């Protein structure tokens, strides 16, 4: 069961006075009075918290008493063992911090900013003062700014009551000013912000995935283009080799067919040259005649032209003189055979 320590008690205090002092804060299970101090046992821990929050520093029988949560190992049924303190009484010399005394703070969205706060006013004093309006779950003083505090309530009605009732009241010689903190008043906004952040993160992730996909697609397209170019080049080379082998394997073709093939190769070669010139000139007219465009136009002209380069002409032209020599040798052999036949006759 929760116990509350009462210090600085008058020696004339009786149990009836303690019951009156704690009336309105729940059911009391037991009262243990000592010389100058005592303990009160509550049925509910919430009632004990409320009593500590509101009754600490209040007057009882002409004395400002200390009301705090009792801490320490229990010796017997009558009470707890506390270290000695100067001035008598069994209050512990190891005083607890304010946060331990008042319990863990609970953050809510019903928040008020307290301005013009006295520098002597601590967060405990501010919390005790604000409990007149309702249940206070969180309090801070001079944390972010000097002469400014923060109060958070359990419900919106408590916050509204404090705003209407305690705005302009005096604490430690200063009239405080209460302002509702609107950005923190609704968790829905924060939830929507977190949702929008998650949505933006999802969008950014999807965008990054799309960009990576488009990059991979562009890379695959460029690879397929380079492969098609290399295939075109290899095909053109193979075609050139085939044409060379055909020209070598058919030395007995007529002169007319040779002239036709020469004229065709010349025409197509001139066409490919004109195409490459027009493609290489077009970027210069647009103001972007770079070296890369020239190399591309050359590679495209090479892949577009199925026939081989001019050197094939020299190889295809080379066979005629051999045939001329063969015809000369045939005429000589014929003349020799005629002369032999005439000599025999």
Swiss-Prot record:
Composition bias, Basic and acidic residues: 264-273, 282-293
Compartments, record wording: Nucleus; Nucleus speckle
Residues the record lists as N6-acetyllysine modifications: 165
RRM domain segment(s): 1-72, 110-183
Sequence position, cross-link Glycyl lysine isopeptide (Lys-Gly) (interchain with G-Cter in SUMO2): 182
Gene Ontology molecular function, alphabetical: mRNA binding; pre-mRNA binding; RNA binding
Keywords assigned by UniProt, alphabetized: Acetylation, Isopeptide bond, mRNA processing, mRNA splicing, Nucleus, Phosphoprotein, Repeat, Repressor, RNA-binding, Ubl conjugation
Basic residues: bias regions: 185-250, 323-345
Matches recorded under CDD domains: RRM2_SRSF6 (cd12766)
Annotated InterPro entries: Nucleotide-bd_a/b_plait_sf, RBD_domain_sf, RRM_dom, RRT5_SRSF_SR
One Gene Ontology cellular component: nuclear speck
Leader peptide range in chain numbering: none
Mod. after translation: Extensively phosphorylated on serine residues in the RS domain. Phosphorylated by DYRK1A, probably in the RS domain. Phosphorylation by DYRK1A modulates alternative splice site selection and inhibits the expression of MAPT/Tau exon 10.
Cited Gene3D superfamilies: 3.30.70.330
UniProt-annotated stretches for the region Disordered: 75-102, 176-345
The family this protein is said to belong to: Belongs to the splicing factor SR family.
Record PANTHER family: RNA RECOGNITION MOTIF RRM DOMAIN CONTAINING PROTEIN, SERINE_ARGININE-RICH SPLICING FACTOR 6
Function statement: Plays a role in constitutive splicing and modulates the selection of alternative splice sites. Plays a role in the alternative splicing of MAPT/Tau exon 10. Binds to alternative exons of TNC pre-mRNA and promotes the expression of alternatively spliced TNC. Plays a role in wound healing and in the regulation of keratinocyte differentiation and proliferation via its role in alternative splicing.
Name under which the protein is recorded: Serine/arginine-rich splicing factor 6
Source species of the chain: Bos taurus (Bovine)
């Amino acid at each position: 069961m929760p116990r509350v320590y009462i210090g600085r008690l008058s020696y004339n205090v009786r149990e009836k006075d303690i019951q009156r002092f704690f009336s309105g804060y729940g059911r009391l299970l037991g009262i243990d009075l000592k010389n100058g101090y005592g303990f009160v046992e509550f049925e509910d821990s919430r009632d004990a918290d409320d009593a500590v929050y509101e009754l600490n520093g209040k007057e009882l029988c002409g004395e400002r008493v200390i009301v705090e949560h009792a801490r320490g190992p229990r010796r017997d049924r009558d009470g707890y063992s506390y270290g000695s303190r100067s001035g008598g009484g069994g209050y512990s010399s190891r005083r607890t911090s304010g946060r331990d005394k008042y319990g863990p703070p609970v953050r809510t969205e019903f928040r008020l900013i307290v301005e013009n706060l006295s520098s002597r006013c601590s967060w405990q004093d501010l919390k005790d003062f604000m409990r007149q309006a309702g249940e206070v779950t969180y309090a801070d003083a001079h944390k972010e700014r000097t002469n400014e505090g923060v109060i958070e309530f359990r419900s919106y009605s408590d916050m509204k009551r404090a705003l209407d009732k305690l705005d302009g009241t005096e604490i430690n010689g200063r009239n405080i000013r209460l302002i509702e903190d609107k950005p923190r008043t609704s968790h829905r906004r924060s939830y929507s912000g977190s949702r929008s952040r998650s949505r933006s993160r999802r969008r950014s992730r999807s965008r990054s995935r799309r960009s990576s996909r488009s990059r991979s697609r562009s890379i695959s397209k460029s690879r397929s283009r380079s492969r098609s170019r290399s295939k075109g080049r290899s095909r053109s080379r193979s075609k050139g080799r085939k044409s060379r082998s055909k020209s070598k394997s058919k030395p007995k073709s007529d002169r007319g067919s040779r002239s036709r093939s020469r004229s065709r190769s010349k025409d197509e070669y001139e066409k490919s040259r004109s195409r490459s010139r027009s493609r290489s000139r077009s970027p210069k007219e647009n103001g972007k005649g770079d070296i890369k465009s020239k190399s591309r136009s050359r590679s495209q002209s090479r892949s577009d032209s199925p026939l081989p380069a001019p050197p094939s002409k020299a190889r295809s032209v080379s066979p005629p003189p051999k045939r001329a020599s063969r015809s000369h040798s045939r005429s000589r052999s014929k003349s020799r055979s005629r002369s032999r036949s005439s000599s025999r006759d």
